């Protein structure tokens, strides 16, 4: 019989740091007695083998001599809720993460979360400022764009935050920049152990506090509130939209196209 279940529900891709989750879980299990470790399970609802990630069963065979279970079936919403509720705690330590849907899902199901303090995952951590109010998107600027530096450490009881040990910026054409923040797997193991130590009624109470937080319409995590805000912003955009004036061409001069003259083997040209 298991008395501590850790749950992961996301893709097996590199930026999700799935291998680090397994290695952190192994490090945690190494730090407790064998008897206690045998009562722990890591459930991973993901594709065990993915070209965008790695071969997780092979990784477990070689690096994690503890109980790891893979869930590969596709479930409807109600069944996913049951799956979340088999867990005592969830874990999400992604890098390059815009939001991290799994984090909100776990909290809505009343399951506390071990989370990397980066990107949008910070939004559901419930960080508080000096005056006791919650940190919001309005507090972020181009000069200070993330709490990954630990400026505010007072957080909601429903999360076990892991502060990134490596902070950098990545990007692409559609996403010019995003935080590539990665935690040390040993720091993750420490937070797993803290959650394990709280297992039972204390951990359940933390999860229920998180559920209460994300269901509060003021913070905008539930779908109905997201839709309401989206509709409001679109209406506001349309109301304030001012089309550009038409450009009239009158007696435009004729443009003569000329072939470029290439300058030898250089990459410059003259027109």
Regions found by a protein language model. Name each.
Residues 95:
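Aromatic "clamp/platform" in nucleotide-sugar-dependent glycosyltransferases that forms part
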């Amino acid at each position: 019989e298991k008395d501590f279940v850790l749950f992961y529900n996301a893709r097996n891709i590199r930026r999700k740091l799935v291998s680090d989750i397994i290695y952190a879980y192994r490090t945690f299990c190494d730090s407790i007695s064998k008897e206690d470790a045998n009562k722990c399970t890591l459930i991973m609802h993901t594709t065990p083998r993915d070209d965008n990630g790695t071969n997780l069963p092979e990784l477990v065979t070689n690096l994690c001599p503890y109980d790891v279970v893979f869930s590969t079936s596709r479930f409807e919403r109600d069944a996913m809720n049951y799956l979340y509720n088999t867990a005592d705690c969830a874990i999400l330590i992604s890098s390059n993460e815009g939001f991290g849907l799994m984090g909100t899902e776990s909290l809505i199901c009343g399951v506390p979360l071990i989370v990397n303090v980066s990107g949008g995952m910070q939004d559901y951590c419930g960080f508080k400022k000096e005056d006791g109010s919650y940190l919001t998107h309005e507090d972020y600027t181009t000069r200070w764009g993330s709490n990954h530096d630990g400026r505010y450490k007072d957080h909601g009881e429903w999360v076990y935050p892991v502060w990134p040990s490596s902070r950098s910026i990545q990007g692409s054409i559609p996403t010019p920049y995003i935080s590539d923040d990665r935690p040390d797997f040993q720091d993750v193991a420490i937070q797993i152990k803290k959650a394990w130590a709280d297992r039972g009624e204390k951990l359940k109470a933390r999860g229920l506090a998180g559920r209460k937080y994300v269901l509060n319409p003021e913070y905008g995590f539930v779908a109905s509130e997201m839709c309401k805000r989206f509709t409001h912003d679109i209406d506001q955009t349309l109301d304030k939209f001012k089309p550009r004036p038409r450009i009239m061409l009158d007696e435009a001069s004729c443009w003569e196209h000329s072939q470029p003259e290439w300058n030898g083997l250089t990459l410059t040209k003259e027109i």
